[in-house]
Amino acid sequence: MTQASQNEKLIPVFQDEVHFRAQTTITRKWAEKGSEPKVMSKPGKNNVAYSGFVIPETGELTVTKPGWFNYESVIQSFREFIKTKPCPDGKKYCIILDNAPWHKKAIRLIWTEALAEYSDIRENIEYILLPPYSPDLNPIEQVWRITRRDKTHNRYFSSLEKLTNTLDRYFSRFFSHNKQLRNLCVFSCFLKTSSTIKKNVGGCVHVTYG
């Protein structure tokens, strides 16, 4: 286990944002040889945005709907997460996220500058920045992948509302402990001792893989 998962006071949580488009997305499918399957598609570029938090050790998934991605929506999603999924007494969440600019600004305000208005977040959350350009190290990317495979690819949605309702129902299946996302999100660089956590003087937490 990594130091993050060995530390009984820290609960690792992977975070990421995603857009799902109402416009039909096409991927491979079974079809009779020589046929030309057709799927209707809604014109336009309407989409719905989600911010997701997955706990790999249990498969629990929590999603929020930020509307758009900026540092304010990141801060709000942190607060919604700890409100929806309160941290057990004596423990803190360790949010693991990528280097998106809106993440970095939220981190600067919450932890680097340690502004008093964000003390509620610091009391419940620490963070880890993944190495740059490494989406393969964030297992919630796999959650988005299977969501598209199971619920949006090759499917026609006549309205953004119908797409949103479909996604909300699907994500709600994983709110509690479940084997599907647990098995999906457990991977070697998370479980093995090759991953270590380091803290610098400013309190910023980084992860290195060796």
PLM regions with names:
Residues 1-210:
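Short functional hotspots at interaction and active-site rims
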